């Protein structure tokens, strides 16, 4: 099987209703990353100094050396920036992404976080890059991070965010069974569920755009006013749409500088001036989402073996299980676990088939109100479809008219008249009969194939979401 693991469909065109508390139009979620004292440093057993997210844009790591200037920039975040932000945000729900070793080196800051009632989620053991870390090393660090976090704060973390993660991170976090949510994703404006083995893991996605890290990156913000404008524009769009979540990422050593902190203060005033704004921690959002939208597992088409797939979807195209068999061999993924997605895969096989094969599918369809219907020998799907348009309750005159049209159509084109009856009533079907009898064969063959595909979509919508 060719299977593509990435989910490119998510909540789709119509996201679920968030139903935020108090009928809020938007949930605003502020994250304060506490990393100072957990960054790369040979004092921490690392091979080199830190080089990421500081005032020294483009800095390089110094192998085997301490970087005095870099260390002092991080120290500013703990010594001054944190307290400026604490004074500003103490009355708001905030989630701290706390590096466990940094928390252990900042007991006064931890006490202040707890006094403010902030959530302290885990940001890992050390603030290092795990993209090349062996899986067993990353797992061991995660376990130690949970242990140390619990030891330092008194309670285990309910949320996890590595940041500089690996392809294994989300799976490893889910496998702990520890977390109400994992935040190592930027894939959506709303929480969503992922299935990892036997674990149903809620993802509360984070942000790298509404994030003060862009003060320390090329093409980022170089003044507080730019950050403020971006936050306000993001807020306005999400507020207008309604039922959305706005995450804001902050770092003590970045937004904690006085020339930037003012932008944050002004944004908070701006957001609070609106009605229907719910400031919340990430754990509050996770609890709300889990209660409002508990996960329900389904038999996902992309995860079925060939026999089960064909048994389930082989009748979507009338009497043509070969189409389902062909679709199973395509590259399928989460995007094909919806009615529209699987429909596309099945139609690809149908459209790519030769003329004789497609004509065979057309001829597998019964006449409308024909002899098979009278003998009750239609498939269950065809029976229900014809009944939906009242074709199972025709008068003698109506039945005679249908049979005459069927005969004329078959004589002209060489295949039965096919129409997605769920889109029509009896009068609409008869009008389509008359109109389509005027087509040339090529035009009508194309239209009949479109109707076959439309029938398949209706059948799939009765079986799958969206």
Task: Give the ranges of each region predicted by the language model.
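A structural motif
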Residues: 196-215
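Aromatic-anchored, charged helix-turn/loop surface patch used as a conserved interaction hotspot
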Residues: 315, 321-405, 455-464
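Catalytic alpha-helical scaffold of carbohydrate-active enzymes acting on polysaccharides/glycoconjugates
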Residues: 2-202, 227-248, 254-296
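Residue-level signal for inorganic ion chemistry
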Residues: 320-321, 417
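A non-catalytic, amphipathic alpha-helix used as a structural packing/dimerization or gating element
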Residues: 84, 140, 144, 230-233, ...
